[in-house]
Amino acid sequence: MEEPLAPPQSVLDAFNIHHSLEPLSGGRGLCFFAGDVILRPVDEATEAEWLGDLLLKLSNLSNPEYRVSRPLLLETASLSPPHRFIENDWTASFFLPGKDGPKNKWSQLFDASRAFHRDLKELVPEPPAFIGSRTHRWAQADRITWEEQRLEDTPDVNHSVLERISGYLARLGRFKKPLSKDTLACQLIHADLTGNVLFDVEDQDLSPAIIDLSLYWRPVEFAEAVVVADGIICFGEGPELIHLFGTDGIRLQILVRALYWRILTFAIQSDLPWLEAHLPRMDFDRAVRLVSECFASTC
């Protein structure tokens, strides 16, 4: 395995960082520690710059119900865009202590999510421009799930993987019913909370930390529905977690879409070595069956 490419000295100077670099586990193996700062490579500069501004605003709110990582401004940053948070395709933000793993902490995760999304709704009244232009597999699967893009028109579909998951998608598709846009208000959401909420492990009375924002413009319930989907697919959770989320007709429809989205992502721009290592651990069949039972009995 190749060593990750470290940020050059010019990046450390730009953020006024004077500590040695250490590779950080997680973050796709691409990030580095420097003292109490994490340096992260940028995938898309426009989105990363926008996100830096959002995280700065969220940090300034100091909401006691959750924490976010405060981004570092460039030493040469002006008070206006476009170059406040990125240097040579790297960003920097302060490290947040905590441990991931939502097992037995689902209620805490939901409470933090709801406080976080209330603030997002206030800070971001309109969808950012980059939301509709992204082409990575999660964005494409999202548009297919919400019937804004057709699967057959989607590039980079791995048809071998799609064949393996098509039965689950078909079963979920039978439960999908149209959702009126008048019923569901969309807003900015974090759609990958499950492994990206850090919890206090040393009795420091720390609120949950929300990291690695994965942003979409969807109903706020979708953020929690993805957590439920992950809980039953990856963590062996059962009907209790579905009950915690809610089992009214609208929430079940959103949960169906969350499961559909999560499963579909594996068939687009597929990373085959990763899939072969992880797909056997994903209990799609049980997840779809649990949701089917909810529709049969309204849980």
Positions of the model-derived regions?
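ATP-binding glycine-rich phosphate-binding loop
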Residues: E3-F33
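Short, conserved active-site entrance elements at the starts or edges of catalytic domains
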Residues: E3-P7, D153-C186
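Active-site acidic catalytic loop and adjacent metal/ATP-binding pocket
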Residues: G27-A34, I38-L39, P71, L169-V220
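Short pocket-lining segment of the protein kinase catalytic domain that shapes the ATP-binding cleft
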Residues: T91-K99
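A cross-family kinase active-site recognition segment
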Residues: D100-V161
